[in-house]
Structure formats: C-alpha cells, structure tokens
C-alpha cells in the first residue's frame, strides 16, 4: 500500500509503490496482456515534441480544449502486451448483455510498442496520463490523454507501458539470436553434405601444388611469385567461420601473393559460342588455397568481345585461361565449386562483396587495385554487375534499409546448380532499368531525409519564435507595470506638492492677520492697568507664528500633528470664529479635528501641572535642532516686563462669560475626549495664567478692605472645630485690619517669577516634538518653592482660621510669626494656591508645627485644644496662640 503523502502534492518516493529498477509485472504477463480501466479524454495531432515541457503542454492543451468543447470522457479498457497498446470501449452491461462481442466496432486505437514515442503522467494531476504515438500512415504524432480513478493506477499504467519497452526489446533480441542459430545450423548441414560429396578435393590440391609456380611465371596476368607465409599449408575450406565485418576484413593481414588461379567449368546454353563441347572457363582467385587445374592456352579476346560489350577491348594476346582438365569428355559434366557463404573475403572498397552474388567468389583487392587492365570475366547471370568497383556504396547488398525503414530492396538470386533457361534470363537493358530504378529510389529517400531535416529546422524555428514572443510579451507586461507605478508615484508627488502649497498659503494667511486678544476686564476702581500688561499670553504661544518667525523652507513647523495625521488641512476660518470656538468643542466640525489618539505619552504628559516650554523635550534631547521658538529666558523677561508695568489698584474677580447654550447633539454639554487638537487645553491654561496674574496684581496693589460688620461670638466646641463649615466666612465678614508693610518690588518680582510657571502643552501638538519619544521629567518649578506646608495648613486648619472672629493686633503678635494679609490669604484660598512663606520661618516636621511653643511640663494646660477652648470662652490667661497657627 502506498504511504500517505507528507511532503506536498507530489512525492515521488511515497507515490511509487515499488522501486523503478524492480519490474512491476512478470514478463510472461505481457504475452497475454495486462488490462486497465480508465476514461479516454481525447487525442490531438501535435508536432514532434523535443522536450518534456512541450509534452506536458500538449497534454494539458488536449484536456482544456476537450473540456471547453464539452466532450465527455468515455470509459475504456487499456490492454498492454508485447503486440502493443490497445484501447477498447467498455460495453454497457445492461443494453448489450445479450449481444455478441464485436471488438472491431468498439476498438478506439491500437499502437504497436515500437510506434509509441513517449508516455508520462501529469505532475499537477496524478490521475492524468498520456502517451504519444506515431501514426504509420500519415507519419504524424498524436497525443492520447486518459484519466484514471486513482493516482496510483495512473502511475502503474505508465510504468507498465515503460516496462513493455524493455520486454519487447528482449523479445526482439531473442528472436534475432534464434534466427542466427537457425542459419548456422542450416549452413553446418550443407557443409556436411558437401564434404561427403567431394572427399578427394584435398588430395587433388596436394598433387597440383607443384604446377602452380610454372603457371604463375608464364602468365603475365598472374600475381608475383608465391612468397606468402600461408602458401602450401593444408587448410580446411569447409570449416565454418565467424562472419566478417568491414572493420575486421579491412584490418586482416592476408598475403595476396599466395592466391593462385582456379578454373571453374560452368555450362551455358544461352550463347552459341559457349557450347557444352567448349566449356566456359572462368578465372577464379582463391584465398590462400589452390585447386587442381590444368593450363590450356586459349585466347579470350573473341569470347569476351562477343559476349560483353562493356568489357575493356584491350586485352593481351598472350593471356590464357586454364582448364580443369584436358579431357574434352569431362567438360560435359557440370562441376560446381562448393564454398561456404560465410567465408571471409578481404576488401577495402566495398564492405559486402559477397552479398551481391554469393554463388560466385569475388576477386581480392590486390587484383582490382594493382592490375586495372586485367579483364574480369563474369558469366551471364541475373542480379550481377560487370565489376564490383563500378558499384556505388550500399548497392552490393541485396537488402537496402532506408533511414526510416520504409523501403526495402530485395535482390533475387539463383543457384548455379539450377539449369538456366532463355525465358528466365534478363538482358542488359533490363538490368540497366533495374539499376536506374534503385538509384531513383535512393534519390527519393535522400529527398525524404532532406525534407525531414527541413521540417525539423522549421519546428526549431517555430519554438524559438514562440519563446521570443513570450519573452517580448513578458517584457511588455513589466514595462506596463513600471509605467503604472511611475504614474502612481507622480500622482503622490503632485499631491504632496499641492499639500505643501496649501500649508504654506495657510501659514502666510494666518501670519498676515494681526493677533486679537481677549477683552481685559477692567476693575471697578478708577485706577487703570498699564496697557503694556496683557492678562493673556496667547500671542506668545510658540504654536502661533509671528511675522518674523515664518520660514518658507519649513512649511510644517507650526502645523499641529492632528491635522497632519488626518491627511487634510485645517479649515480656513476667521480669527473671530477661532476665538469663539476655542476650548473644548461640543461637536467635531471636520475630519481633521475629529482625530483621537489614545497614546500613553500624551496622557502622562498632561498629568503634570508644571508648565514647561513648548519644545522642552526636543530641546533637552537634541539642542542643535533649528526651530524658531522663544526660549524660557525670553518668557521670563517678558514676565518681568509685565511686573514692571504694574500700577496699584483694587482687584476683584471678573465675571465669567456666560456661554450661550449651543444647539447641538450634546446641547451645551462639554464633549471631553482625548485628542491631538491643541485648542482643547488653551482655555484652562488661560484661566490659570489669568488667575496667577490677578494674584500678582492683588499682591502688588494696596487694598482697602471695607469694614465688616461685627460678628456674633459663637460657642466653639471640640466637635465644631473638626466639622466642615457650611457657610465659610468671606472677606466682607472679617474685621478690617491694617495690612503689614509690603515688601520691596524686587522681592515681589522674585515671588512672581517663582509663581509663574511655563505653559504646558503636549509634545504631540507640534511636528518637531512628535517625531521624538517623549521624556518623563519630574514636575519641578523653575525656582524652588515649598508650597507643601502651606497647602497642608490650608487643608487641615481651615476651620480653625475661619472660626476665630477676633484677631489680635499686629503689635501683640509674636514677631517670629508669618505676617500674611488676610485678603491675600482669602484670595489664595479661593484659588487653591498659597504663596510660599518667608525664608526666616522654616517648618520641618508636622510635630513641630502642632506642638510649637507648648510647655511639655504642663501638657494638659498648654495643649492646643485647651488653649483654643479657653480662648473661645474669653480666657486669655494662657496667652496668644503659638507661632505658626493661622488667625
């Protein structure tokens, strides 16, 4: 069973059931045939394929075309045997159950094994296999495609047909070997019969050996004297030998000087010259042996001129033909020289001298090359040529095989022992016609070979043209894709240029408009403020460019990151609409403003209340960045200019603007969210800055507090000391008191510089700082301040300072105590901020703060609660409150 595939759609190791080197079937099974069931897809005529890619392409083209035409697959039976591959339609068992089996009607195709060109399966779909066969009639190739029900079955069919090639090759080799064995057996039987017919042949050779030298010396046409190493040896003429080939015969060293002349007597009744009384004498050269003969001088000139007109006319008059015997009575008995057909004859010009006429022994090469003027005598026999040297190469073979095995020339031969008749012999004209016909057939075959070569060149040219066209189409596709990409890049560049143009124009438009400030609230007193002192520093915000801070090479230097992330520009509005829409908005107005970023960096940047410069993070991390923003020193100098222009006056809390209820979805409610919009936190910053400036103005200007009406003394208890007051007293409820002397202006400037903190803004509101990671820094003010003790005193002892109605005079107060005006404390309490204490007073611990000026020897009497209770009852025996407690 095949192993389940684990390496993808095609695994040759897992799909092959057995090793390819092991035969799949027994060879005897191919004699009967191996049957398979499959579905026949279709066939199509294709050119001769050269590569596997062309074969797979032809297979898939057949599948797709037959599927597009809607031709259904037909179930067939495939039989693979040594005869070939036979495809037969399957019978329908229900309809044709009673009918006889007629295979001729159901036969689809039959191809012998030697006509099958290629067989393979599709690597993508293992159920599909095909084989390409050559049609014998049209000499074309057809691709036949089949589909099996299982992948393993398709592979078994392919391997079965592949094994059939080997089986047929072995069968052909066995048949050839059997044929050679039969021929060898027949030749052996014939040689044994001839040996029994002429037992005295060897004795005659020994007796006639001495006469051979005399005949060679007296005859000019004979070879030089015998001097070969094999002369005079007794050799058997009837021993079978191995057939000679061109290479073996050409390389064999045989001494031609040891070849004598032999006389063969052949009766011929077709010519009146050659009568039985005057038997025909044929000169015969035997290799390395001699036959018994008798020399009889006779002229051959007249005989040869009368018999053949194609032989050379110049003949030496001294040439004689030997005879076998001088007895004329023996000439009537036809004698035939018996020689085995597989006798080797060396030659260099023609590889097969014995195959043209095996009945007549041929001359060796030495006689054909050395003595060209010697006439070679041939009897008048069918299928023979006057001279073997005049034949072209290949015509001496009786069977001619064309390169495509389509033409075979079988030459007829006759035995010498059969009597010749005048009706069965052909004339010289008929022989010439036969020769011309064979030459014509050879020319036709040459033309056919040339045509096949031309067709092959055409196919190669077609495949190369197709490949070049495919390469050109692929190049065209790549060029079109590159063109599309270039167009997209050009569109992006044009869009970026348009955005830069719009941003630059927006910057110029915003810088050309004069900055408009919020209306400053005028106090109720007649003393006006200095016009140089603005209550809002919105125009000093580095996010808003001035006339001199615009740089054309930095178009994004003042663009908020929210607008850049949204991919659009902020809407163009008038300055009045911007002032109206500042702060937290109820509804988003555009896609650019409706951006929400829940980044953690923006969250912890907003947690600190310490106001930092606009680009504090980027300046700390990279101080070499060229950004045109005001530094902290410039901001502090501006604050000092504001302090220098202060004039004394009264201060009061300006009334807040009443916002009209907006008609929106939220109906006036604030839409709080996390966003990169820098306008959302500006209102809080302005309020904080305005309160800080008002604090500074209140501290600088002398105030006249109106006298408060006398308040009723309340009974102060311990419970009431630690309960929050429902109605805290205001400044008007307090008694007027004389303010302590104000400190100098320089000290006040110092305190103001301490209280003023730099405005806070997230790093993501600017493009320059948004590209760098934010830096967490502790919330430390510019100048070290210590508001912790005051805040603690405000929160813990608020009720104590509120419940005391009568405050002691400044003369009675301890000189070490902090002297702070009540109006300053009330304003600080109202705003949640207290100025730092003086440097001469230092409170380190809470215990020291609570138990100050307490006599520890008299703890029950000098404790804080005892003092407060007695003071509330009017008992001032314990003295004033300790230093550090609020009044």
Swiss-Prot record:
The organism's taxonomy opens as: Eukaryota, Metazoa, Ecdysozoa, Nematoda, Chromadorea
Pfam family name, one: PID
Q: Which residues form a coiled coil?
A: 434-506
Species, as recorded: Caenorhabditis elegans
Q: When this gene is knocked out, what is seen?
A: Mutants synergistically exhibit progressive myopathy. Overexpression of dyc-1 in dys-1 and hlh-1 double mutants, delays but does not prevent the progression of myopathy due to reduction in the proportion of abnormal muscles. Also, reduces the locomotion and egg laying defects. RNAi-mediated knock-down of isoform b induces a dys-1-like behavioral phenotype consisting of hyperactivity, exagerated head bending and a tendency to hypercontract.
Checking PANTHER family in the record gives:
CAPON-LIKE PROTEIN, PHOSPHOTYROSINE INTERACTION DOMAIN-CONTAINING FAMILY MEMBER
Q: Where is the composition biased (Polar residues)?
A: 242-254, 597-606, 816-827, 863-887
The protein here is known as Dystrophin-like protein 1
Per the record, its GO cellular-component terms are: axon; dystrophin-associated glycoprotein complex; striated muscle dense body
Per the UniProt entry, what are the Gene Ontology biological process annotations, in alphabetical order?
A: locomotory behavior; muscle cell cellular homeostasis; positive regulation of locomotion; regulation of egg-laying behavior; sarcomere organization
* Superkingdom per UniProt: Eukaryota
* Record GO terms (molecular function): nitric-oxide synthase binding; nitric-oxide synthase regulator activity; structural constituent of muscle
Chain segments carrying region Disordered: 176-254, 506-606, 641-753, 804-839, 853-887
Q: Which function does this protein serve?
A: Together with dys-1 and hlh-1, participates in a common muscular function.
Q: Which UniProt keywords apply?
A: Coiled coil
- Gene this chain is encoded by: dyc-1
Bias-annotated ranges (Basic and acidic residues): 176-186, 205-216, 573-588
Compositionally skewed regions (Low complexity) per UniProt: 510-519
């Amino acid at each position: 069973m095949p192993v389940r595939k684990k390496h993808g759609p095609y695994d040759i190791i897992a799909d092959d059931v057995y090793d390819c080197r092991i035969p799949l079937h027994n060879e005897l099974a191919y004699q009967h045939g191996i049957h398979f069931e499959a579905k026949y897809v279709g066939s199509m005529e294709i050119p001769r394929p050269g590569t596997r890619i062309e074969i797979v392409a032809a297979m898939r083209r057949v599948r797709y075309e037959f599927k597009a035409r809607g031709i259904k697959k037909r179930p067939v039976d495939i039989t693979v045997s040594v005869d070939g591959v036979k495809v037969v339609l399957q019978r329908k068992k229900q309809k044709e159950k009673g009918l006889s089996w007629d295979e001729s009607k159901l036969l689809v195709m039959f191809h012998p094994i030697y006509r099958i060109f290629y067989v393979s399966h599709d690597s993508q779909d293992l159920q599909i296999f095909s084989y390409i066969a050559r049609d014998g009639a049209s000499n074309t190739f057809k691709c036949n495609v089949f589909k099996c029900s299982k992948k393993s079955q398709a592979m078994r069919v392919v391997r079965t047909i592949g094994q059939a090639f080997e089986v047929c090759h072995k069968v052909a080799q066995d048949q050839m070997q059997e044929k050679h064995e039969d021929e060898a057996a027949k030749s052996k039987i014939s040689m044994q019969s001839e040996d029994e017919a002429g037992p005295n042949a060897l004795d005659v050779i020994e007796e006639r050996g001495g006469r051979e030298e005399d005949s060679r010396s007296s005859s000019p046409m004979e070879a030089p004297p015998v001097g070969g190493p094999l002369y005079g040896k007794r050799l058997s003429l009837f021993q079978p030998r191995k057939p000679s080939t061109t290479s073996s015969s050409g390389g064999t060293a045989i001494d031609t000087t040891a070849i004598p002349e032999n006389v063969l007597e052949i009766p011929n009744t077709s010519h009146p010259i050659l009568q039985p009384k005057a038997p025909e004498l044929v000169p015969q050269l035997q290799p390395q042996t001699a036959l018994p003969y008798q020399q009889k001088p006779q002229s051959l000139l007249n005989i040869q001129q009368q018999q053949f007109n194609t032989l050379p006319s110049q003949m030496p008059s001294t040439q004689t033909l030997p005879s076998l015997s001088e007895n004329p009575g023996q000439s009537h008995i036809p004698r035939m020289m018996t020689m085995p057909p597989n006798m080797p004859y060396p030659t260099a010009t023609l590889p097969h001298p014995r195959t043209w006429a095996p009945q007549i022994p041929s001359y060796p090469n030495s006689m054909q090359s050395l003595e060209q003027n010697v006439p070679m005598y041939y009897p008048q026999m069918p299928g023979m040529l006057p001279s073997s040297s005049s034949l072209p190469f290949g015509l001496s073979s009786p069977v001619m095989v064309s390169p495509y095995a389509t033409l075979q020339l079988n030459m007829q031969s006759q035995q010498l022992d059969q009597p010749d008749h005048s009706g069965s012999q052909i004339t010289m004209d008929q022989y010439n016609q036969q020769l011309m016909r064979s030459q014509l057939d050879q020319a036709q075959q040459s033309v056919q070979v040339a045509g096949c070569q031309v067709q092959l060149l055409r196919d190669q040219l077609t495949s190369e043209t197709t490949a070049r066209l495919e390469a050109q189409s692929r190049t065209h596709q790549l060029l079109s894709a590159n063109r599309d990409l270039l167009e997209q890049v050009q569109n992006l560049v044009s869009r970026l240029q348009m955005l830069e143009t719009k941003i630059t124009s927006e910057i110029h438009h915003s810088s050309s408009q004069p900055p408009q400030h919020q209306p400053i609230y005028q106090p109720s007193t007649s003393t006006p403020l200095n016009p140089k002192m603005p209550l809002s520093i919105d125009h000093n915000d580095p996010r808003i460019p001035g006339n001199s801070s615009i740089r054309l090479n930095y178009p994004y230097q003042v663009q908020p990151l929210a607008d850049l992330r949204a991919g659009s520009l902020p809407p163009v509005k008038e300055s009045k609409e911007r002032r109206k829409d500042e702060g937290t908005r109820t509804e988003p107005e555009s896609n650019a403003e409706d951006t929400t970023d829940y980044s953690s960096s923006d969250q912890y940047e907003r947690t600190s209340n310490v106001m930092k410069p606009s680009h504090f993070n980027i300046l700390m991390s990279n101080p070499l960045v060229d950004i045109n923003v005001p530094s902290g020193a410039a901001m502090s100098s501006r604050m000092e200019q504001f302090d220098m222009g202060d004039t004394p006056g009264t201060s009061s809390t300006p009334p807040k603007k009443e916002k009209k209820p907006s008609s929106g979805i939220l109906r006036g409610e604030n839409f709080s969210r996390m966003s990169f919009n820098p306008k959302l936190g500006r209102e809080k910053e302005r309020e904080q800055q305005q309160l800080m400036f008002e604090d500074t103005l209140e501290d600088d200007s002398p105030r006249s507090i109106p006298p408060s009406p006398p308040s009723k003394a309340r009974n102060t208890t311990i419970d009431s000391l630690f309960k929050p007051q429902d109605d805290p007293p205001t400044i008007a409820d307090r008694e007027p008191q004389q303010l302590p002397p104000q400190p100098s202006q320089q000290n006040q400037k110092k305190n103001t510089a301490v209280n003023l903190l730099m405005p806070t803004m997230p790093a993501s509101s600017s493009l320059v700082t948004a590209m760098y990671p934010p830096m967490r820094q502790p919330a430390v003010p510019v100048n070290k301040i210590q508001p912790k003790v005051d805040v603690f005193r405000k929160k813990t002892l608020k009720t104590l300072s509120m419940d005391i109605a009568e405050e002691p005079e400044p003369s009675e107060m301890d000189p070490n105590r902090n002297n702070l005006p009540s109006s300053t404390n009330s304003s600080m309490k109202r705003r949640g901020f207290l100025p730092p204490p003086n440097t001469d007073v230092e409170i380190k611990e809470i215990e020291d703060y609570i138990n100050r000026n307490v006599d520890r020897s008299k703890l029950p009497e000098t404790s804080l609660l005892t003092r407060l209770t007695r003071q509330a009852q009017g008992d001032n025996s314990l003295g004033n409150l300790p230093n550090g407690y609020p009044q």
